[in-house]
Amino acid sequence: MQRRTLLTSLAALAGSSIAPFARAQADYPNQVVRWIVPYPAGGGTDVLARTVAEAMRATLGQQVVIDNRPGASTNIGAQIVATARPDGYTIMSADNALLAFNEHLFGKLAFSPEKDFSYIGGISRFPLALVVNPGFEAQTLKDFIAYAKANPGKLNYASPGNGSPHHLAMEMFKARTGTFITHIPYRGAAPAMQDVMGGQVPCMFLDLAAGLPVIQSGKVRALAIGSAQRASQLPGVPTLAEAGVANSEVFAFQGILGPAGLPAPVVSRLNGDLNKALASAAVQKRMADFGMEALPGTPEQFRQFARSEALRWGPIIKATGIKLD
């Protein structure tokens, strides 16, 4: 009798602890959702996150607040999310750096892209274009390569930071073309782009999410684009392959992660609202305006896409010898 009473009490206690958690999942979301962006405000990642967050507010029924936490090749923001409570109220933008590059760039990470995050879904991918200041003497990519070879070490390029897609795109370009161009890292795409426009640094790889308006306005000049086909918004700009640099497709991609252990109903809710946002007219127009390609789908599809990019970039990063620690 005593044993039966003890078991009954334990079962009741377990049920009382599980019930509030189950109700919290059923009521999700019932408070503000914090969206970590591991880059400064004003860059392509930030613009995209704010656009999608605005669309998601309508279906989630809660505010989605952007919290910019730049630094350490996205590792600062990633650490915040990896250690957050897995309740769906802390999510983040995740891109090539976190999901494809950092495991190859750092000897040791405080978290694993595979084990310490819940994959929620993809947002978009967008190609990078090699751009120069309008006053730079090279008019074509062929001219640019010839200038770089004739002036080894005298040409600088900007990037949003060490280990960014823009940084590694140029390093791959250098390896493919046999050129020596010095890296000048910035804290975000916006300040890097400003200095290329101002002529302080002559060139950079620039993602279309941030760069399309300044390319179209003539504030920078695009020599080539790192996509498989030409961008419809820039029909006069050749791809890198068309301009003679083969096997050099370079693009940035974005998706959403949460901490590991997010309950399946929460992941499903966030993924569904994300896909609704990507299908909305406002988000589709904004993406088209910035040369983006939407990446709707399931959490597993996004995870597989990210892992395929990690496998693609691993040998490239190893060949360049770049390390960030």
Region locations from a protein language model:
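Conserved functional loop/turn residues at catalytic and ligand-binding sites
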Residues: 5, 10, 32, 68, ...
